Amino acid sequence: MSFEPTFASVSQHQVPDWFHDAKLGIFIHWGLYSVPAFAPNAGELSEILATGAWEKWFANNPYAEWYMNSYRIDGSPTQAYHRAKYGPRFNYAEFGPIFNQAVEQWDPDAWARLFKGVNARYVVLTTKHHDGFLMWPSQTPNPFIRDYHVKRNLVGELGNAVRGQDMRMAYYYSGGIDWTFNPQIVRHITDLQQAVPQRPDYVEYANAHWRELFDQYQTAILWNDIAYPSATNLNELFAEYYNQMPDGLVNNRFTQKFQMDAHGIVSDNHFDFETPEYTSFSEIRAKKWESCRGIGASFGYNAMEGPEQYQSVENLVRSFVDIVSKNGNLLLNIGPMPDGTIPQLQLERLLGLGEWLAVNGEALFDSRPWQVAEGKTDVGIDVRFTQKSDSLYATLLDTPVTTQFVLANLQAAPDTMIRVLGQSAPVTWQQREEGIVVELPVALSSAPAHALQITPQPQRLS
């Protein structure tokens, strides 16, 4: 269908099957902030969303990609670090030549092979973060800082490598903040509205970049951040994009009246999916959503983070299973070093998730939510449900110590077959009033989670 530049028209756009099927994306925060690689270890965003302690958050911001804001806040740990490390007169833009030299070592094909190997289906690269530095030599360069962009075309090179591995390539763009156009320091959540550049030259600048990203680089998603200038006719931009990329998507961060709730940004415009950050939803959502988070507490590389700041493989697996059961995707972030090296702790977690998915991915990829997301066993282990074709997948979020357990409140058909993914030994079962009694031939080896395929799908008892 052809889209017109109206809300009624663009709202007819449907989330494409590929995004429902994909489940796992890789987010990449990489830029000038990767050079200082500093942020205090102050916890995760979810804690701030729960408490509302925003002034404390921004003064002690654990997001290393916010370095340009944090080092301008008087008395902040980042300001103290910057002055001690680089001196009070060292300007943020001076990280540019350092970054440009470092990225000469980067191998985009190695990244693409890694992402494919861990079973990711799509990749989202930051093309411009809030600092305004461009990750490609755009036809619309920054008008205030000469050569304020990377010399290599990271956008184009990674796109080619990712598509060469049969994954989708998408691009993040900070339309809501650009400190080269509006240097507003963000000390509180209320400052974000004032930080959005509304000047006409920025409106043209941001719109030109988005058009470049879908005209020349075929972005699979318009992954905007924070907000967008109010003068832009977004329905026109979205219609133009959809007419070029019918299976593309628009996220919910193009809001022109900045609002937030406990799950993040609330949009006042059309969008295809929601984007809770460092949090997720507790129930199946009718609207598609994508939870984004770092492996640690920062998106950009933070050299101050250690093992205690990073999620374990077990937590990543269980969170991912929970998200998928509720109609979500996981956009899991890596924060590379300036030369493209993925820090070892991040790499270990990524590979661990991929290793689990190599055995159990069938339960998640190409699946859809079932009637309910959550279930129980009689051995105290929680269950998450997904469905595909005629099968129900029941994923245990831990390893039972016994070879017999009950999948509560399920009624199996007489011809039901049950198998544990990754095992060839047959599973026997019997029906009881409380549910399906599963009898394993041998105890399961320890793993973050175990997926069972039940065919045909059972009925719910309650």
Label each residue range with its predicted role.
Residues 1-462:
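Mature catalytic domains of secreted/periplasmic carbohydrate-active enzymes
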